[in-house]
Amino acid sequence: MGSRALVHLAVGLVGLFGLRPAELAVLRVDDEGRLRVGEVKRNRWAMRRAKSERLAVGIDIPGRDGEGRRILQLYASGLVKLPLRILTTIERGEFKPVGEAFRKLLERYPFWQSLATANPGLTPYSLRHGYAWRGHKAYERSLSVRDLAALMGHTPAVHLQHYGKWTDEAGLIDAVERLTTDPLTALVAP
């Protein structure tokens, strides 16, 4: 299996399922074929409750229908594994280094290098932000903050603080136009 396919699997899991890169270490497919994600963040809030798993559901990139299902099937089949650098880091049992291994792996690939050059500030975590954006903006109907926060493994407050930065005037007008039949862009200034 070529290394490109292995990286594609890792990028697909992080980007299409909204994972923290470190969560590549705590994935499993349950008996119903759903992706489950263990905990990697153990902050004060998380320490007060038992470790649990959350459901991760893919949100496809528009025009790439079924890609999340395909990535999940590849992962579940075991025919395509995560890249060796990530697997050996997972074996050490620490989570943060898994995210670092993912970042270093991406930085070696020309496709990521060209994306990063064209989009200053792009990081591996941007794949997770893209998931949040698609859940709220890419489709005619959007997921609620509460639902998307649960899928991403954080609270609605954290979601609003860190994943709502793309709100701008044009986006607000578009959102209202999708909700109503009033074309706000046709308004004429007095």
Language model: regions and residue ranges:
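Major-groove DNA-contacting interfaces characterized by cationic-aromatic clusters
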Residues: 60-115
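Catalytic-site neighborhood detector that most strongly recognizes the C-terminal catalytic loop/helix
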Residues: 41-45, 152-177
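Short, cationic motifs built from Arg/Lys/His that form the positively charged side of catalytic pockets
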Residues: 6, 19-20, 53-57, 128
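Short, basic (Lys/Arg/His-rich) helix/loop patches that form interaction surfaces
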Residues: 3-4, 17, 95-150, 157
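Conserved tyrosine-mediated DNA breakage-rejoining catalytic core shared by Y-recombinases
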Residues: 26-74
